[in-house]
Amino acid sequence: MKKRIPTLLATMIATALYSQQGLAADLASQCMLGVPSYDRPLVQGDTNDLPVTINANHAKGDYPDDAVFTGSVDIMQGNSRLQADEVQLHQKEAPGQPEPVRTVDALGNVHYDDNQVILKGPKGWANLNTKDTNVWEGDYQMVGRQGRGKADLMKQRGENRYTILDNGSFTSCLPGSDTWSVVGSEIIHDREEQVAEIWNARFKVGPVSIFYSPYLQLPVGDKRRSGFLIPNAKYTTTNYFEFYLPYYWNIAPNMDATITPHYMHRRGNIMWENEFRYLSQAGAGLMELDYLPSDKVYEDEHPNDDSSRRWLFYWNHSGVMDQVWRFNVDYTKVSDPSYFNDFDNKYGSSTDGYATQKFSVGYAVQNFNATVSTKQFQVFSEQNTSSYSAEPQLDVNYYQNDVGPFDTRIYGQAVHFVNTRDDMPEATRVHLEPTINLPLSNNWGSINTEAKLLATHYQQTNLDWYNSRNTTKLDESVNRVMPQFKVDGKMVFERDMEMLAPGYTQTLEPRAQYLYVPYRDQSDIYNYDSSLLQSDYSGLFRDRTYGGLDRIASANQVTTGVTSRIYDDAAVERFNISVGQIYYFTESRTGDDNITWENDDKTGSLVWAGDTYWRISERWGLRGGIQYDTRLDNVATSNSSIEYRRDEDRLVQLNYRYASPEYIQATLPKYYSTAEQYKNGISQVGAVASWPIADRWSIVGAYYYDTNANKQADSMLGVQYSSCCYAIRVGYERKLNGWDNDKQHAVYDNAIGFNIELRGLSSNYGLGTQEMLRSNILPYQNTL
């Protein structure tokens, strides 16, 4: 595991020192103009046995003990070179040593360099046996990478493993600019351990010290080391001034943590954000615990709440052990429904409507797998608190292929549903689904014939409250048995497009599927986990109209579709278009009176869907999709986008997305009842742009307009200045942050963010536009 955020003072000698410079080409090349390179042949291995070469205008001495060289003195051994006006060479026999100890004192215009560093000063000393070197009151410059500074005394020790600075400084700014620097009474940089120790560390902006620590141990390479990360600040209308100061803790080789005090002025307190990562034999995981001891804004808005403590707990784990055991955790829980409205968090969003808490343990061997899981939901609604959890759920699959010409499978599930309310129905559901397939295929097509049996048993309890308030009654014990038959055929035709586009190839891929499922009245079964599935082009060929098992719609239908693709001479897909429809011979029904279109008795071509993609050129791209459902009497969903993308930092995109209110109600019935902002559906047009506007300036922006409400939905504007030693980013965002039921209007949050990045700390000279675009509440999605 590597923490990818550069440490705040890691420059203190070196992340810069050992970063790979392969970045935003223009700026990176400009920054390297002031950086020296090692232009002599690099000597590998132990250089102590190599001869010492000395050139000078004059020489005198007492051979073999002492010698004095004056006038343009130049001493070389291996990769090391020492130059000075005068050099005194001393050679002494050391007891018990086969070789004499050779040292030099250098005076006047001392210059030492090797393949890693250049040291300059008025006075120097070196041990030619050990490569220990001292330079007093001088400057240093890293070779081949940004990094320079000054010190009263600069020392190279341990055959260049250690660089030690007494009263030293460091900056990655080029010569002539000291915009920022780090100074310390002593700095020890260990190249092997990739760590720097700094005593009495002060971080300076220009001549002004803004940060002090009596001792810091900081990472200066790829090895994980504890230390402060780059702080951040912003201003929002929700929390006013906010400031972050993260600290990275390298606990062990297989675990680390990031602890971030997050001050929020309006909340009147500090939120402690704690991220913990780990690796184990059972897999990898991440935990996040955020805790705000008290919140004065929440106290004012919820005077009847006993506690104003706000918190979030997130746990994600995925792993395999002994090649057969699978462990997965996806758990998010917050203190209250307003949490994601009040606080930005990468582990959840107010637009999700709920948080999931899921644990699962699986076992898998050849032809067999089984999973035991529990799943709960925390609904972010103060009006509708009803939600079902699976406590527990068992899923079992057994496969046996090549049974003669057939493939077989048996799927089984047992689950117990519990509601958060005491008066709602609960159930135990047992489902068995044996399947047999006859797959046939050749080079140009395939046909798959499938038959299965859907057998489900429900044992429902706690029905009194529901049955007393509804005309359709639920039964305690229900058995539902449904056969299913399906034939799915595909063909692929190809042709060369030599006449229109030499080297290009076009495919035509027709597909047809017949599906039959008889009708079973399911009105005596409560809907515990079923919802309408999205009917995009690929969704037209699903077996089920609904997810889950509580609603299995009858089907006597033919689905037809065709896809055409165009590939260039490098086999890159340049264009595709897909169009399909479902033709119903009889009405698709479940018997649920709450599904409004089941009363329409519609047949014929009811559902249409189409998708398209066109890579017009290397820089232009177009995507689109539309789904029409006559049962909803309108277009269910549609989306489109066109994009010009020159490179990562130069792009312009126009997009549109639409979802009808009937479609939202059908797919998210429980969320729809409380989501006032979506009662009229979604119809939003948007624009996203990122472009450098000057030599080192770039701008990024996004704007979304709700055509139903005739008002802005979301917007963002960011400006960044980049130089060789720092970058400044200022951003503004206005985003939808909930709905005021009393005033019946949307609630917006305005945020101003400010961030400074010290350059030369990592290999990234990019403008950061992708990060800014994807952090938006409606994140940028690539069209190309």
Swiss-Prot record:
<feature type="signal peptide">
    <location>
        <begin position="1"/>
        <end position="24"/>
    </location>
</feature>
<comment type="similarity">
    <text>Belongs to the LptD family.</text>
</comment>
<feature type="disulfide bond">
    <location>
        <begin position="31"/>
        <end position="724"/>
    </location>
</feature>
<keyword id="KW-1015">Disulfide bond</keyword>
<dbReference type="GO" id="GO:0015920">
    <property type="term" value="P:lipopolysaccharide transport"/>
</dbReference>
<dbReference type="GO" id="GO:1990351">
    <property type="term" value="C:transporter complex"/>
</dbReference>
<dbReference type="InterPro" id="IPR020889">
    <property type="entry name" value="LipoPS_assembly_LptD"/>
</dbReference>
<dbReference type="GO" id="GO:0009279">
    <property type="term" value="C:cell outer membrane"/>
</dbReference>
<keyword id="KW-0732">Signal</keyword>
<dbReference type="GO" id="GO:0043165">
    <property type="term" value="P:Gram-negative-bacterium-type cell outer membrane assembly"/>
</dbReference>
<keyword id="KW-0472">Membrane</keyword>
<dbReference type="InterPro" id="IPR005653">
    <property type="entry name" value="OstA-like_N"/>
</dbReference>
<comment type="function">
    <text>Together with LptE, is involved in the assembly of lipopolysaccharide (LPS) at the surface of the outer membrane.</text>
</comment>
<dbReference type="InterPro" id="IPR050218">
    <property type="entry name" value="LptD"/>
</dbReference>
<protein>
    <recommendedName>
        <fullName>LPS-assembly protein LptD</fullName>
    </recommendedName>
</protein>
<feature type="disulfide bond">
    <location>
        <begin position="173"/>
        <end position="725"/>
    </location>
</feature>
<dbReference type="Pfam" id="PF03968">
    <property type="entry name" value="LptD_N"/>
</dbReference>
<comment type="subunit">
    <text>Component of the lipopolysaccharide transport and assembly complex. Interacts with LptE and LptA.</text>
</comment>
<dbReference type="Pfam" id="PF04453">
    <property type="entry name" value="LptD"/>
</dbReference>
<keyword id="KW-0998">Cell outer membrane</keyword>
<dbReference type="InterPro" id="IPR007543">
    <property type="entry name" value="LptD_C"/>
</dbReference>
